[in-house]
């Protein structure tokens, strides 16, 4: 038996359901039945969504937070902000109950589309984390399990990711210099 005490279970619907509410409901229900947890957060596969329909459907099925708002080919702030905000439904002219959490960095973006190496990862992540801290924003990154596997294609990435996460965690508490010193 699996116990879910301090875990948050997120929804990662299959690629084909971004505009199919029936399949979206079916997949979410299946996940909730398996985990016995009410699922309230989401990230679309390949960051694929259709504006505004996908966000409207998420709200309809009880999702309260989404983490799909990022670039697949670039790093940076797709919504021009690193601060979560409620989706404004232009069709219904209202603020929805769905909070969007902008995604700033994704592993595949760095390696595949931007040609970055593992040696560059720490500097890139720490630079964004420092900028985000200055405005009290939220640092949302996306790293897939295979990029942390240290296999041939991703060799060196896990170590640099761990180093960056350690620094970013300390940056929550300390200033830049102290966080850097303590992360070594």
Locations of the language-model features?
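Alpha-helix N-cap and loop-to-helix initiation/capping positions
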Residues: 19-23, 116-120, 156
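C-terminal domain-boundary segment and adjacent tail
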Residues: 4-6, 119-184
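Active-site-adjacent pocket scaffolds in enzyme catalytic domains
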Residues: 30-135
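Short loop/turn segments at strand-loop or loop-helix junctions that form parts
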Residues: 14, 101-106, 143-146
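Acidic, glycine-rich loop-and-beta core segments that form the ion-binding/anion-interacting portion
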Residues: 1-39
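Acidic-and-aromatic substrate-binding clefts and catalytic sites of carbohydrate-active enzymes
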Residues: 1, 15-24, 43-52, 73-78, ...
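Conserved beta-strand positions
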Residues: 11, 44, 141-143
